[in-house]
């Protein structure tokens, strides 16, 4: 059978996505490390590469796709070696055509050919999978409709208390690459979400569970708590503060209010 797609998370975890569809926003309530008895949250965000200006990968249809979907040949009108940010091993490529879309993990790049080898670190390259695989967007005879490719990024945020327990930090992880520190001395990360379903429009929920879905998320409510680097000489304790904010999200689904 098909392997579950691995979900990037904190070091030492082996999370998987709940379905073959990776949403634009993937809540991860209580999947982060525990701090002072409080489980923290993680989040995975999927978005298209919008920073490639000279030769966007989706400017022209692909020149060819291997019959089993294991590789693609990019049009010479999109020279890979002249991209602002060249395609590399570990990138994620979305293939789209009239049959649907699928996400693949780059295992090799040679000339204009991008390869999606088996047994990739995220289990994305499974041409034999019954759903969500590259063969599902083919014609069934080894050929494919006109197909475009686009690089996408899967960004994961979580807290890390292991690298230096004295300096807990916020980590940003791109695809399956190692995480990088983006902020220091943060002790708590909590997320909730406002949904638009056209019926009850739930607010401040920790996850979008059935009958709702992550595609209905319209707003993320974020709480970050941090402390000072040194203890206060008077109180002998750290100074702690919390920041709350909201981030509005667009274009995750469409509801016709005039129907």
Regions found by a protein language model. Give the residues of each.
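Short linear sequence signals and composition-biased patches located at protein termini or domain-edge surfaces
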Residues: 2-36, 120-259
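Autoprocessing Asn-cyclization modules and mimics
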Residues: 12-129
